Regions:
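Hydrophobic/aromatic beta-strand patches that form the interior of the parallel beta-sheet core
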Residues: 36, 67, 71-77, 183, ...
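Structural motif
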Residues: 4-6, 139, 222
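Short hydrophobic segments within beta-strands
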Residues: 8-9, 38, 142-143, 185, ...
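Leloir-type glycosyltransferase catalytic cores
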Residues: 82-129, 257-309
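Active-site donor-nucleotide binding/catalytic segment of nucleotide-sugar enzymes
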Residues: 78-87, 110, 114, 122-194, ...
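Short acidic-hydrophobic, aromatic-tinged amphipathic segments that line or gate anion-handling sites
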Residues: 54-59, 204-206, 262-268
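Donor-binding and catalytic core of enzymes assembling or modifying cell-surface/extracellular glycoconjugates
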Residues: 17, 155-251
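Active-site and donor-binding regions of nucleotide-sugar-utilizing enzymes
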Residues: 1-93, 215, 230-232
């Protein structure tokens, strides 16, 4: 008797979103496999999916082992350990497909987030309140930091150089807040000039539900981010984005072939590949330490990219 499969998906929500096309293909190509997905990092973005929602389980689900795992083979896909990924031949969604489906490098569909009425209305209410508070009609969501960011006293640092430098993103926000209702998507508050904030307020809502954040991005006019979750939400919502890449390669972590994505690669020609989830070397992060330091010209380029949308 052939056993079905229990796939274990770990990591952040961006990885979950990028896994969706691979699982859709697996379901289509393996109709006899009654597979499940064990969500070690949460099942938020399997929710609402027409077929995958019923296959997804939080890893604390009661009876998960005895009722669902015990009679299945366990598989843990790791896209960062796929040859095509760490040699810059594919993106994250394709790496999941290679690892899960074993069909080699091929084109995969776009992920999709399925929001319900409550999520849409709640996000629309948040955005409308911010528009009224700022007096601006156009809304820009800014995600300045990736998940590797750390705080040390008053300092905000990303040792992997995937995030904006604090002084750079503050400069960018100070320019764009005069033209847009800006919503900062960050668990870490961004320190802005208080006197200017009274004239040009910037919203920093603490929204714990990532699905609400995805709906906020959907309602907004544009997204500005780095190597972080938000851009994968934008892709799954068919939105527009300006993405700044430094220590990571656009082909791996973003969508350079999507005309709705304007990717400004400030690390081009300067970075080396950091073997995330492969080794614990620190040499690469040290080499990449300054790749996200922006020049005045690059800051102008970023602001102009946002204005195009």
């Amino acid at each position: 008797m052939t056993r079905s499969t229990a796939f274990f998906i770990n990591g952040g929500a961006g990885r979950v979103i990028c896994s969706l096309p691979a699982f859709e293909l697996y379901e289509k190509e393996n109709p006899d496999d009654d597979f499940i997905i064990v969500c070690e990092g949460g099942m938020d973005f399997y929710k609402g999916h027409p077929t995958l929602h019923n296959r997804a389980y939080d890893h604390w689900h009661k009876g998960l082992f005895e009722e669902h795992i015990k009679d299945r083979n366990c598989v843990t896909p790791e896209p960062y350990r796929v040859w095509e990924y760490y040699n810059q031949k594919c993106d994250l969604a394709q790496a999941f497909d290679i690892d899960i489906n074993n069909k080699g490098l091929r084109k995969v569909g776009d992920p999709k987030i399925y929001a319900n009425k409550q999520e849409i209305v709640q996000a629309a209410t948040i955005v409308e309140e911010i528009k009224q508070g700022t007096g601006k009609d156009k809304v820009l969501v800014v995600q300045p930091f990736g998940r590797t960011t750390e705080t040390h006293g008053d300092f905000i640092v990303d040792p992997t150089s995937r995030s904006f430098q604090l002084n750079n993103i503050v400069d960018i926000i100070n320019v764009l807040k005069k033209e847009y209702a800006i919503i900062i998507m960050s668990e870490i508050p961004v320190p802005l000039e208080e006197t200017e904030n009274k004239q040009y307020p910037v919203a920093q809502p603490q929204i714990p539900d990532l699905r609400i954040w995805s709906s906020v991005i959907d309602v907004a006019d544009h997204f500005l981010g780095c190597d972080s979750l938000g851009q994968h939400m934008v892709k799954a919502l068919d939105g527009t984005a300006t993405i700044i890449t430094g220590s990571t390669y656009p082909i791996n972590i973003s969508y350079p072939d999507d005309p709705k994505f304007d990717i400004i690669d400030v690390g081009d020609g300067k970075r080396v590949y950091a073997p995330i989830r492969l080794t614990m070397e620190e040499e690469q992060d040290r080499h990449n330490d300054e790749v996200m330091e922006l020049t005045t010209k690059q800051i102008d380029e970023i602001c102009n990219s946002v204005r195009k949308h």
